[in-house]
Structure formats: C-alpha cells, structure tokens
Curated annotation (Swiss-Prot):
Family: Belongs to the cytochrome b family.
Record-given protein name: Cytochrome b
Cell compartments where the protein resides: Mitochondrion inner membrane
CDD domains reported in the protein's UniProt record: cytochrome_b_C, Cytochrome_b_N
Organism: Hystrix africaeaustralis
PROSITE patterns with a match to the protein in the record: CYTB_CTER (PS51003), CYTB_NTER (PS51002)
Cofactor annotation: heme b
Positions of heme b b562 binding: 83, 182
Gene: MT-CYB
Length: 384
C-alpha cells in the first residue's frame, strides 16, 4: 500500500515541499533563515490576531486600548511585546536572508528573487502601518512625514496624499484604513510566500559553492527539519530574552506619549529596521530626489541579476568580492546609525558619503571587481 503522504492530494504537496524534497547536501546555516521567516510570519499573524480582538482603531481610544491590552488583558503585555519585537526579529531574518542571496548568488533564480523583492516591499509597508496603530507621538508624526513624501510626485502628489489620509491631515480615516491594511496584508504576504516557494521548488535550492548539485541531493526530512528546529529554538530564545528582559529596547520612548498634532517631537524617525533607507532619503537635499533614492535603495535588488558579471555564481571563491560585500554590510550599519541621529554636522556628511558608497558598490564597484576576478582567474590558469 502506498504511503498516505505520497498519495493524498493535500499531503502529497506537503510531502514534496518539506519531506521528500531533494536538497543539496552542503547548504549551511545561512539557509535556515527561510524557515525562520516562515516561523516569524506565523508568530506575527497569531499575536496580531489576538491584539486585534482588543484594539480599537479610533483616534481617541487607540492609545488607551493598547494600554488596556498591556494592563488588563491576560498576558496582553506578552502578546503585545511578542508582536512588536517579533517584527524586529522578522526584519533581522529578512535582511540576513537577502544578504545570503547576494553573497551566494541566489539572485540568479530571477523569478524567486523578484517575488522575494515584492515580499520585502509588502512586509515593509505592513510594518510601517503597524507602527502607526498605537497612536503615540512617533506613530502620528512618522505617519505624517512618510505619507507626506508622496507629495513630491509631480502634479498628482498633493491630491494623492490627501486621498491616502482621507482628509487634510493624518486623522481618524487614516488610522482606520491603516488598521484595515495592516490586518489584511499578512494574508497577502502568506500567498506571496507560497508563490516564492513554488518558484524555488521549480529550480531547487542553491548551495554555498554555487555549482549544480543534482548529483548530490538528500531528503529535506529528517536532515534539514532537525537543523531548522535548532535554528527556530535559537531564534525563539533570542526573541524571548528580548521580550522578557528589555521589551522597549528597540522602541522609541516618544511612543509612550499620546499623539498630539500640536506638538512635534524633536527628532522624528521610523523603527530601527527602516533607518538605513531613511538615512538615504535624508542625505539628498531635494525632496523628489530623496524619495526616488529611498525607493531605489530597495528596488536596486531587482537589477542585481543584470549586474552579475562574474564567471562564478557564488562569492565563496572570490576574495575581492567578499571584501566588497562586507564593506557593503558595514556601510548599511553606518546608514542605520546615521538614520537615528539628528540632522546636523557631521551626521549629514557621513550619511551622504555612506549613501554614495551604497549605490556605487552595488552598481559600479562590484561588477568591475567581478570582471577583474575573471581576468585574474584566466591569468592564473595560463600560468599553471
């Protein structure tokens, strides 16, 4: 008799995706982040669902409803902080997942990569709208500043901003629609994740060497299920330490003050995971130029496959490209730091230099370095 997991219409799909899936035998811990992102998404949807049961999307009660969740709801404080810090964990895994894709050349699976970029944009939009919901000072002013950027679009900008606001300022209508979108977008993200996996399983996983591994595959279960469970336990440990010992570490103190349209905070900034893009936005004096740079700082990932000039897929055997990759990583950390600093000297200059470095490394220096490595490899072969 055939095993039910191989014959049942539904179980067969799960079997081909998570049990009998042929997987390269040499994939490292950097390949764990896909499953961790799935776990983060489940945590966010479940905690978000319970928060939505007690939250009220109305300007006069939103702030107090969040306080009510933390004070009066059983384990409400735990659910709220798991959701807030779960978002931070989500973005840590997301950025490491993208970084692994860049390092090992996973972007050569263009369909999977492009769906991944779409997922990144959707998750960022969801997180931004979620940050507005507690209706604290930083929620209100963050929403005002970021949505106001759309007014830089020629001709239709102002009308578009007022359409998104549902009035002439961020108010009741804005909060209601942001809650509606924040609630519904995770389900769209889940659908996109399934499409992402569908395209990935068409080609099979990449591996650290970047070469074809069809001759050396092992089943996903039990080898990688055990490995993923270990990664999940480590991530949950880190998340629980953050939630139980310093839940407000990554938040902004201003958000514990109810939103006041008449009082502007001294320094408006988004959550830490958007600071690198915010620093790029602020480094350009022109409003439209800043908005375009902000969008392109993420959209640049879409043209990475076109800029791949190396004869090798992975950076594993390309020391110069490796150096550039880690310089880029350090540069992003500098941009994140600058995004959280006030707009004054020397932070403005550092931000501008880091922004120029970010784009020039990805667009110019990396492709040229790859060409140079091809030449060096050719010369080495000739010498031998």
């Amino acid at each position: 008799m055939t095993n039910i997991r191989k014959s049942h219409p539904l179980l067969k799909i799960i079997n081909h995706s998570f049990i009998d899936l042929p997987t390269p035998s040499n994939i490292s811990t950097w390949w764990n982040f896909g499953s961790l992102l799935g776990a983060c998404l489940i945590i966010q949807i479940l905690t978000g669902l319970f928060l939505a049961m007690h939250y009220t999307a109305y300007t006069t009660t939103a702030f107090s409803s969040v306080a009510h969740i933390c004070r009066d709801v059983n384990y409400g404080w735990l659910i709220r902080y798991l959701h807030a810090n779960g978002a931070s964990m989500f973005f840590i895994c997301l950025y490491l997942h993208v970084g692994r894709g860049l390092y090992y050349g996973s972007y050569m699976f263009t369909e999977t990569w492009n769906i991944g970029i779409l997922l990144l944009f959707t998750v960022m939009a969801t997180a931004f709208m979620g940050y507005v919901l507690p209706w604290g000072q930083m929620s209100f002013w963050g929403a005002t500043v970021i949505t106001n950027l759309l007014s830089a679009i020629p001709y239709i900008g102002t009308t578009l901003v007022e359409w998104i606001w549902g009035g002439f300022s961020v108010d009741k209508a804005t909060l209601t629609r942001f809650f509606a979108f924040h609630f519904s977008l995770p389900f769209i993200i889940t659908a996109l994740v399934l499409v992402h996996l569908l395209f990935l399983h068409e080609t099979g996983s990449n591996n650290p060497s970047g070469i074809d591994s069809n001759s050396d595959k092992i089943p996903f279960h039990p080898y990688y299920t055990i490995k993923d469970i270990l990664g999940l336990l480590l991530m949950l440990t880190a998340l629980l330490i953050l939630v139980l010992f310093s839940p407000d570490l990554l938040g902004d103190p201003d958000n514990y003050t109810p939103a006041n349209p008449l009082n502007t905070p001294p320094h408006i900034k988004p959550e830490w995971y958007f600071l690198f893009a915010y620093a790029i936005l602020r480094s350009i004096p022109n409003k439209l130029g800043g908005v375009l740079a902000l969008i392109f700082s993420i959209l640049i990932l879409a043209i990475i496959p076109l800029l791949h000039t190396s004869k090798q897929r992975s950076m594993l055997f390309r020391p110069f490209s490796q150096c550039l990759f880690w310089i880029l990583a350090a540069n992003l950390l500098i941009l994140t730091w600058i995004g959280g600093q006030p707009v004054e000297h020397p932070y403005i200059t550092i931000g501008q230099l880091a922004s120029i470095s970010y784009f020039s490394i990805l667009l110019i220096i990396m492709p040229l370095t790859s060409i140079m490595e091809n030449k060096l490899l050719k010369w080495r072969v000739l010498v031998v």
